[in-house]
Amino acid sequence: MQDPASHSDSLVGRVEVKETTCYMCACRCGIRVHLRDGEVRYIDGNPNHPLNKGVICAKGSSGIMKQYSPGRLTQPLRRKAGAERGESAFEVISWDEAFAMLEERLAKLRAEDPKKFALFTGRDQMQALTGLFAKQYGTPNYAAHGGFCSVNMAAGLIYTIGGSFWEFGGPDLERAKLFVMIGTAEDHHSNPLKMAISEFKRRGGRFISVNPVRTGYSAVADEWVPIKPGTDGALLLAITREILDKGLFDRDFLVRYTNAAELVIDDPSRDDHGLFYRAEMHVEPDCFDPQNKLWWDRDIDGPISTHTPGADPRLMGRYVLPDGTPVKPSFQLLKERLEQYTPEWAAPITGIPADTIRRLAHEMGVMARDQKIELPIKWTDCWDDEHESVTGNPVAFHAMRGLAAHSNGFQTIRALGVLMTVLGTIDRPGGFRHKAPYPRPIPPCPKPPHGPEAVQPNTPLDGMPLGWPSKPEDLFVDAEGEAVRLDKAFSWEYPLSVHGLMHNVITNAWRGDPYPIDTLFLFMANMAWNSTMNTVEVRKMLVDKHPNGDYKIPFLVVCDTFASETVAFADLVLPDTSYLERHDVLSMLDRPISEFDGPVDSVRIPVLPPKGECKPFQEVLVELGSRLKLPAFTNADGSRKYRNYPDFIVNYETSPGSGIGFLAGWRGKGGDQFLKGEPNPHQWEMYAQNNCVYHHELPRSYQYMRNWNKGYLHWARAHGMIRYAEPITLHLYSEVLQRFRLAAQGKRPGRQPPERLRQRVETYFDPLPFYYEPLESRFTDTQRYPLNALTQRPMAMYHSWDSQNAWLRQIHSHNYLFLSPKVGLAQGFADGDWVWVESPHGKVRCMCRFSEAVEPGTVWTWNAIGKGAGAWGLAPNADEARKGFLLNHVIAEELPAHEAGEHLSNSDPVTGQAAWFDVRVRVYKAEAGEPEVTSPQFKPMPRLPGQEKKRGKWQAYVAGIFGKQAS
């Protein structure tokens, strides 16, 4: 091998280092891309980036192989005339032809019935733009992948504490002493969390992981607590009961910062039963909780306005107000609810011994009580009380999809929020800390459209396609209480479906329920494979026809970077760029990368020109918005407003003159303003000069207690993050849920649920968290199907993005079913055998591996490693297709017909969260002589026009050999 130092610059070639933001997962680390003669040769972490500080993972460094993947789409494609959908029979067309097709079709739909156009996207990180496009077009049928991912986590915590894990908050491991992680796979939060856990353990912190599987983060935990899937709520409620019984809750925190002491009307005969008693009745603003409630003061032994100086409210007891109204503090109601949830009750449900549950509760409670943190930071609360320091209780939690992806996930996550609250850990040192733009009011201000009248020809929606209902009047239903959206979000079936129900879109569109559509536009959403449930049947729906020969879903547009399984079914294919070829924003209007100490947003700036005819999806939307003359994309005379996407990002404002746009940094003509300021024509250049990231560090006095921090709330209002500088009281007791329950009981005027759904709403909209068995288990013979089945993301793969990656395939080219040896022993098969995994909905054949690191009643596998033959540029006989498998084949997207409806989604009844972890299976050995290949198999997908036929010279590159010798 030759020494590169001995070569001249002319032999080495032109070497450049360019900075941008990674997109190999949702972590969005800063990266440096090293190029030689315009080709990517190395990617490393940017040491000057506040998020990852130079650290990079296997995914991030493998972005080279994503860039040069043979799975790349490079030209717009149209299904050939006479060819059947699903056959991948395409012809190349120009972008002018593609835009003309879309403009003609979408303009006609917008002029006649905008809801016949549906736009659904995957993990795209640009929902502020896609949501804006849908609103401006006038279609309610829009959502991203959240309903399929972790909407229960977002909704469950935001409706409880005003913020959530992941982008909007997380564990303060810098100061925590006890860290409890529940239901979190290896991909979530990635580098920053790994770095934080490493430092936490070096400082002697104790790490407990609660998970059915011990992989990834759990493997480095001090204690692994295996739990049966879907029973986390039972554990959390039992722990909370123990903490209350032992008096280990933070009374001062509960009184001052939560609704624990607020008096709730306790008279089931009244129509306002379960609502807070209000000292004055008036029309409430849309999005803050007025401080017009009462406490029961122990000194005067009577009612008093909340936060009266010197008041000492009671948390327990039953009282009668002077007007005869019986009331209880909401904490009393919580305590009564928890009486049934003993450790002995929870033990057989969770598989965790009662003594362990008691020990965990004691450990959390004592740590929070006895190891308090005090920081010398002065701050002033909303009631003008000045504090000399910020205090904290050093117990931190982190949780994700393991809790969320169940039909009981919303109430489970409400239970987690209540536990975190009674321990006094919210936005305090060592506990949970918010990230801008959160905290927000409970619930946040935006609301969905209110009814069918919101959808009008050639008119934007009167609300956002997605929002945060606070009462039945906020639902998006017709006069009969039935859904207006295609996915039935914001209907009485799933009232708080704040992220939509992507997983039911194809089924509903195929059935024409609640109505037929014309055009389904999918971006980066592999909805014919791993981004759906009941995959075999969904693929059939995409090709199903009416008796007259027309497709039941008339027109399908797919925009993607790669030849995914879904591309085969498209009528029109739009080739997206890679993340190294485009401008992109990770915006405060969307899902930013903020830190605990203040807002952070970032950008991607092209380091390479687009491959072939690829065009960024963002450019596609700006172009379509201009052609369709959508108001946000055009001037008053209908002329085009923005040259392109970068111009749109610089000059767009949320309202004329608001000074608030997609990017927070370097605003104002001279780039000297932040968060709010007039457009800066040099904004992109300033981001490029500053590591592609903007980090605004708040004053220390604004960094904690932000729900009630006067300085922070006024700052947040001034910079457009919230509308009102009002305290954001934590909701131990949810009056929002009680309003829906009262409507279901017929005790509330206005919108009422259809009769078939009254019992469903009354049951699941409980204002206090409760545990119930996952819905699918009620319709499944659990004796025949005794095992829970799960998937999780491996550390080296993210969704289905990376199975075409030449480097990462060497780590995961196929997946196994992992299970306890006890299952194999009972069923007569051995480690490595071919087995069948069967549910009531379908079955898959795969190879198994025994593992002691799994709860004995659970089987699991890596998600999205299995691929359809020929997809993603892989050979039809690739391991991903022959040995890899997809568990989605055995998961139903709908529940069996029952009293609440014939076609209810297999989802959480509150949020519509896909319940893909609820599935029950049995596992048995494949018969001798069966093919040693996974099942089901599908017809191989041929290589598409524009895909590379062979791998380029870049894959033969050897470090240390430069210039022409490497070619």
Curated annotation (Swiss-Prot):
Cofactor(s) needed: [4Fe-4S] cluster; Mo-bis(molybdopterin guanine dinucleotide)
Entry's Gene Ontology cellular component terms: plasma membrane
SMART domains, A to Z: Molybdop_Fe4S4
Deletion consequences: Deletion of the gene causes a strong decrease in sulfite oxidation rate.
Entry GO MF terms: 4 iron, 4 sulfur cluster binding; metal ion binding; molybdopterin cofactor binding; oxidoreductase activity
Compartments in which it is found: Cell inner membrane
Domain 4Fe-4S Mo/W bis-MGD-type: 15-71
EC number: 1.8.5.6
Disulphides: none
InterPro entries to which the protein is assigned, alphabetical: Asp_de-COase-like_dom_sf, MoPterin_dinucl-bd_dom, Mopterin_OxRdtase, Mopterin_OxRdtase_4Fe-4S_dom
Record-listed [4Fe-4S] cluster binding positions: 22, 25, 29, 57
Database matches in Gene3D superfamilies: 2.40.40.20, 3.30.200.210, 3.40.50.740, Dimethylsulfoxide Reductase, domain 2
Membrane topology: Peripheral membrane protein
Keywords associated with the record: 4Fe-4S, Cell inner membrane, Cell membrane, Iron, Iron-sulfur, Membrane, Metal-binding, Molybdenum, Oxidoreductase
Cofactor note: Binds 1 [4Fe-4S] cluster.
Domain of life: Bacteria
Record's catalysed reaction(s): a quinone + sulfite + H2O = a quinol + sulfate; a menaquinone + sulfite + H2O = a menaquinol + sulfate
PANTHER family, sorted: DMSO REDUCTASE CHAIN A, TUNGSTEN-CONTAINING FORMYLMETHANOFURAN DEHYDROGENASE 2 SUBUNIT B
Record text on subunit structure and interactions: Forms a heterotrimeric membrane-bound complex composed of a catalytic heterodimer (SoeAB) and a membrane anchor protein (SoeC).
Purpose of the protein: Part of the SoeABC complex that catalyzes the oxidation of sulfite to sulfate.
Family to which the UniProt record says this protein belongs: Belongs to the prokaryotic molybdopterin-containing oxidoreductase family.
Name the UniProt record assigns to this protein: Sulfite dehydrogenase subunit A
